[in-house]
Amino acid sequence: DTGHDSIRNGVFFLRDKLEPDDFIIVHDAVRPILPRKAVDEVIRVAHENGNASSSIACHPPIVYTDDFKSGVTDVDREHVMLTASPQAYRYSLALECYEKAEKENKHQFTFTSSLLIHYGHRVYFAKGTTSNIKITKPEDLALFEALLSIPEEKLYS
């Protein structure tokens, strides 16, 4: 199963268990360093706007490529946010989008936020943290171990 399938299955499982105005929070298990303040911020922004995605401003230069060998244009990073989990959604909104995607056989969306955008919804940003790293490669473990030695209050300010 893909990440899309896992989240969709969870959303569909909750059909008779949640009220439409309840919220769900989605987080990647491969992102184990998550300060409580980051979760609180996602919840706060979601309650204000119906959804929220943990996000940070993009600082490194970004270049668009069509072949992964060379760059064809740079991307204005002043208008780019890096999003990650946790993400929170009003349950009725998530359910509506996953039901549409299921009917249209669209399963390419890794994040629910991408699905919302596809169906014309605005996604709101909650202040994230660079310490919320995704551990997918062996070298990520060294960074993870180093981050474990930093007090939580210094990981999110």
Predicted regions and their residues:
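Short glycine-rich anion-binding loops that position phosphate/pyrophosphate groups of nucleotides
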Residues: 1-2, 29-32, 130-131
